[in-house]
Amino acid sequence: MSSSIDLLKLIAEKGADSQSAQDIVDNQVAQQLSAQIEYAKRSKKINVRNKLSIEEADAFRDRYGGAFDLNLTQQYHAPHSLAGALRVAEHYDCLDSFPPEDPVIDFGGSWWHHFSRRDKRVHSCCPVLGVRDAARHEERMCRMRKILQESDDFDEVPNFCLNRAQDCDVQADWAICIHGGYDMGFQGLCDAMHSHGVRVLRGTVMFDGAMLFDREGFLPLLKCHWQRDGSGADEVIKFDFENESTLSYIHGWQDLGSFFTESVHCIDGTTYLLEREMLKCNIMTYKIIATNLRCPRETLRHCVWFEDISKYVGVSIPEDWSLNRWKCVRVAKTTVREVEEIAFRCFKESKEWTENMKAVASILSAKSSTVIINGQAIMAGERLDIEDYHLVAFALTLNLYQKYEKLTALRDGMEWKGWCHHFKTRFWWGGDSSRAKVGWLRTLASRFPLLRLDSYADSFKFLTRLSNVEEFEQDSVPISRLRTFWTEEDLFDRLEHEVQTAKTKRSKKKAKVPPAAEIPQEEFHDAPESSSPESVSDDVKPVTDVVPDAEVSVEVPTDPRGISRHGAMKEFVRYCKRLHNNSESNLRHLWDISGGRGSEIANKSIFETYHRIDDMVNVHLANGNWLYPKKYDYTVGYNEHGLGPKHADETYIVDKTCACSNLRDIAEASAKVSVPTCDISMVDGVAGCGKTTAIKDAFRMGEDLIVTANRKSAEDVRMALFPDTYNSKVALDVVRTADSAIMHGVPSCHRLLVDEAGLLHYGQLLVVAALSKCSQVLAFGDTEQISFKSRDAGFKLLHGNLQYDRRDVVHKTYRCPQDVIAAVNLLKRKCGNRDTKYQSWTSESKVSRSLTKRRITSGLQVTIDPNRTYLTMTQADKAALQTRAKDFPVSKDWIDGHIKTVHEAQGISVDNVTLVRLKSTKCDLFKHEEYCLVALTRHKKSFEYCFNGELAGDLIFNCVK
């Protein structure tokens, strides 16, 4: 299949990778590279030097790990460090939405942030609204003087003004507002956009849906308390960061609240629409779009959701002991229910109301202090505030009185008391028995609210159900208010003008040869406004960790297929670097918490827990001994000098990533390779179609080279090609793993054969193809089995799957028994896959029945048979089976070769398979089509599914009859 990639769209949305600028254009400055190639999010590297907790680092990676290359160095303590790190990333996230060469306005931002990165196109409106703003300008002047004295590259004046955004006359089509809207509000931002001629604005604010409901709350990730104070136009909201002495923030509630409650605003003939995009890390990203196009009137609706608010009941209690002012207190629904259930049974009307309230208060104290599970108090409940406890007990007592009175009235109303009473209750009151004892005055008061008789004990509502969502609806601006419009023809004129302008700019760039210049090596650091200059750093410069050799020149592809392949190869380089950095970061964290320093480790006991979970975690002592008996060989280790090879007299720590630490070498080698131009043909065959046999038949000695995804596949192919000399130098040279080929190089070949190509990253395959200088790639695999998976949940793969130019499909299997055909067809139907090649697959196997299943209660019911291969979906089940296998007469080599996860087993072919699930807890892999397909198609003769308990959505259970 030919590639059909839109080049302009690709550059705008994905782009190339400016992290390896030397690989694209040698000796080009980063700014020229960004302007010529792309201005994509993933081309930015952000160094965060703040010390973030594990939870904060995970949240930061989850929010921006796919958009930027994050380097968390954990160097400095800083006030509200996560908020500062997020603020830096938010700048680039918002700026990357706009054309890279157009001017941009920053409302309320820091001019230093853009000046230090040489981003001359951004104009900052930095008004002095108080002494804090004035002090910030002085601090920025200090930083500017420092950078001017340390570097000769800065000769531009910062692009900013001291005007309010509404009063500035600088014009631009785009704008950002990073936490600058608190004092402007939605309509204030619209006024600023109107004065600047801005069409699209993107910004961020701290967000908590409970602000619409409560008077105070807490943003857990930012560790920020907020509190609403005052009322009406004077109401403010205060933000205080927990356990920090930095200045707090106070803003008008009407301004901040407008981002939650309003959606549209009109100024003259322009309509401004607010859209809330994303809520992550307690920060909401939004955009405001201006339009002059004619549009019909519509109702705009949005909802603000409160997390877990439905678990509570609102209890009305008097505020400051006033009969006229009441406030709502949230009490856990389970607490209120249990208090009412117990107190209702013990309630006695003959007692004084204070005695009944004491009983309610006693039950309330017990139920709000503990949570009972299975008859035992095993966890603390949600204690009430000391100021609210007595009033909540009072309100619940009066609520019980109300219910008894209403039940009494209901029973009395059900008795026959004549036609007059019947007419009054059924027709006049509409069957509402609650009015029986309130009298005519209360009835009239309910119809005329001005009488204000709804705060008495017999009519007040003490309990209210809380909704977990606040709904807002607003009409778009009426047509009568729009005085000027662009017509549809005007819109098309704008489109044509943009295209012509782009063509003109391209022509000028082609006519002008950019001068050669060295990429600056300085790193410039930025900090949040309220922290020290060292606290946060973010670099936009290309990564200089991998510098190509001077003689290596990487050509920049210009065709759509080349651009796609270039992006895949750069993604593979970034992925390898990410995994290497993760390994180093994990080991650094372990070294720090264990008190490692020099040749001493202060707290060796911490390794006991880690070693019990993973026996590859160990400590090498300076005397040459190991803290635990050495079972594995390690190539590198970690200490205060970093990750790398160590000497016998050094103290260092290791884990499983130290056994074969080659990711950095793979990344460096891959970064030097140009994009290959060879064609890629895919042989897409069903499971057991004889792909290894096909490789053997297609292989031509002296012309072809074979590459596999892993060592086991390479050994199988060598055994098939060279059964007698599979360990010879010839066999080892022509059949290689992809990692080995990249690290050590490969001989040139005419054709590259790839086994289990789906397990390789697309960029990894392209790197091997480029190194081999082949003219054709013949890839063998199954596009419906397990594909390449990222080992970093925060790294989003855009080019992981293989892209081919031609595809040949094979429908015949020689391995799978006949009943597997039906089981896989059922699997595909349950997954809704109607276009699968397995819909028409056939089998040459003589085995008609092979699938069975058996219920077990523990791993002790699994008998280890040396003639079977045991598969699991999870590493935990695999470890449990390996422990179980030690009770049987099998060797360690047998355990390593015959107990695998399904992912590890892809590509193998054995006679008998047992798939084991030892837990009934949630496991999404049993719902994944590709994993279940691999599990069902590894055997030739028999397959047994041993499962412990029912698991919702278990495809294996449903497909094995």
UniProtKB/Swiss-Prot annotation:
A biological process term (GO) from this entry: positive stranded viral RNA replication
Gene3D superfamilies registered for this protein in UniProt: P-loop containing nucleotide triphosphate hydrolases (3.40.50.300)
Domain ((+)RNA virus helicase ATP-binding): residue spans on this chain: 655-810
EC number: 3.6.4.-, 2.1.1.-
Region described as Disordered: spans on this chain: 503-541
GO molecular function: ATP binding; helicase activity; hydrolase activity, acting on acid anhydrides; mRNA methyltransferase activity; RNA binding
Region of interest (Methyltransferase), ranges: 48-380
Residues annotated to bind ATP: 685-692
Alphavirus-like MT domain: residues covered: 71-260
Basic residues bias: start-end ranges: 503-512
Record's function text: Involved in the virus replication. Contains a helicase domain and a methyltransferase domain. The methyltransferase domain is probably involved in viral RNA capping. Involved in the formation of ER membrane spherular invaginations in which RNA replication complexes form.
Family: Belongs to the bromoviridae replication protein 1a family.
Protein name: Replication protein 1a
